[in-house]
Amino acid sequence: MVLGLASFPESLSSQSETATQPRRPSVKWDLGSDYRKGTEETTASGSNFRRERLDSQPDLGLHVQPQIYFLRPRSPLPKLLFSLMNTNDANVKKLLPKSHLSRVIIRDNLNAQRICEMEMKASDKTKRKMSYLYDHLKKKFMMDQLRKMIRWRRDSQSTQDYLDKERV
């Protein structure tokens, strides 16, 4: 607080100097600067900023506006499309970042592929069993029909013989 009072007379002289100088705009479009350089400047100026309450500081009447820098937007990262089908692990490791998450994703995809293959094998096995069962039931039905026909013929034969004797 004492420092603020000590700089009070200097601020009066700087106020008269700012009145004669033309006002600079508070916003600068600095598209030529690098992103990292701009962040270093803002952090350096932020470290010198005194953290006191605004009402505790006397109004010096400097009318100094803060400088705002708009940084150049970052270029987007190119999107990569890849499939784990028909690729070896070396190519996949080149594309994915070196983290544990990429290994988990690869392992999870391989597990999903194994589960899918197991389900396909089980469904094929079930289809084969069902086709064998269908063939078996079809054959059984045909044999039952044939036995019925033979039994009816045998039963009807005795009746037919009796009717033939009666006609004669």
UniProtKB/Swiss-Prot annotation:
Membrane spanning stretches: none
UniProt-listed InterPro entries: C5orf52
Composition-biased stretches (Polar residues): 10-23
Top-rank taxon: Eukaryota
Chain residue ranges for the region called Disordered: 1-52
Biased composition regions of type Basic and acidic residues, renumbered to the chain: 31-40
Pfam families referenced in this protein's UniProt entry, alphabetically: DUF5528
Full protein name: Uncharacterized protein C5orf52 homolog
